[in-house]
A protein has these predicted regions:
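Membrane-proximal soluble regions of multi-pass membrane proteins
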Residues: 37-134
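Multi-pass membrane catalytic core of lipid/isoprenoid biosynthesis enzymes
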Residues: 103-158, 162, 240-241, 246-248
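Core segments of transmembrane alpha-helices
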Residues: 138-145, 187-194, 242-244, 289-295
């Protein structure tokens, strides 16, 4: 029985067609992650704020120079907690998917990756509002990523693992581009998964190099940011960028790869930042840096970290 299951996984699931199907399903889930994770992170922040406002001990630790929370602060905390409770649980699985325009629940047969979008003629079956092209675009992109690794690596467990790494980076890039947010849930999960994969011998580097890459990925941009803030009074990057590069370092291991990704990201982001500054002047807001880090990292993973390292060495 075990040999049959192993052969089924190798011949069917990990084949190129099987990985395409797996990628379409993964792309559908990735759309949920991209859409819901920022809201989940925002709800977490509101919940933490309400707990801080309603707990005198936590308030005194956070604001030692201020008096205990006033009646108005307590009332605001109660309002926040009430609003969160009234809206119900909000996770990757709850509530069920619904049309953002008419709030009509999406039936299971309307949620089949790519096919439902084509069958519904790109419109909601309830209100007729157009369904964004982003959803099938993500599904097709993820399917192509899974197919690429199935073709390049063959029917091995490493193929879906590295495809999942690319998908996580893709999700972080899209979220940061849309919301200027790199959720800790995703960056930290990617970081710890990279360290665990190295420790278990699943990655292309061992645990010591994975730890080195993660530390290098966090400390170098953090030191750049400290220097920029101190000498130029300008922030270089945010904490989410440090965590993202640390996660990339955990998977790639070699500091030279992490450094190359950072250099490419800086040189590609700089022209966009200068154009933004020229257009908007001093009022220009900082552009999200996550996509500039994620894009070269995805390219390195697609080509193969070992191959890129041999070129750079």
């Amino acid at each position: 029985m075990l040999s049959f299951l192993r052969e089924f996984v190798d011949v069917v699931v990990l084949s190129v067609p099987g990985m395409v199907v797996l990628g379409l399903i993964g792309g559908s889930f990735l759309n949920v992650v991209i859409h819901r994770t920022p809201t989940i992170a925002e709800r977490d922040q509101w919940e933490q704020a309400s707990l801080l406002m309603s707990d005198p001990q936590a308030w005194s630790l956070a604001f030692p120079d201020l008096a205990a929370p006033s009646v108005a602060v307590d009332a605001a905390a109660a309002d926040i907690q009430g609003a969160l409770a009234k809206s119900g649980p909000y996770t990757l699985s709850q509530p069920g998917s619904a049309c953002p325009k008419c709030s009509r629940r999406i039936r299971w047969y309307e949620n089949v990756p790519l096919l439902s979008w084509l069958w519904l003629r790109r419109r909601c079956s309830g209100c007729g509002s157009p369904i964004s092209w982003r959803y099938p675009a993500v599904e097709v992109t993820v399917a192509m990523i899974f197919a690429w690794f199935a073709w390049r690596l063959g029917p091995v467990p490493a193929a879906p693992m590295w495809a999942a790494v690319c998908c996580a980076l893709l999700a972080l890039a899209v979220i940061d581009a849309q919301t200027a947010l790199l959720p800790d849930r995703l960056t930290q999960a990617l970081l710890w998964a990279g360290l665990a994969a190295a420790a278990l011998g699943w990655s292309w580097v061992g645990a010591p190099l994975a730890v080195t890459g993660a530390a290098f990925g966090y400390l170098v941009p953090w030191l750049c940011d400290v220097a920029m803030r101190r000498y130029l009074a300008l922030p270089a990057m945010a904490a989410g960028d440090f965590q993202l590069l640390a996660a990339i370092g955990a998977w790639l291991g070699q500091p030279v790869l992490v450094a190359a990704i950072l250099v490419v990201a800086i040189f590609t982001a700089l022209p966009a930042a200068l154009l933004r500054l020229r257009r908007d002047g001093p009022a220009a807001s900082a552009a999200p840096f996550g996509p500039y880090l994620a894009a070269p990292a995805i390219l390195v993973v697609l080509v193969g970290p070992a191959a890129v390292y041999d070129v750079l060495r």
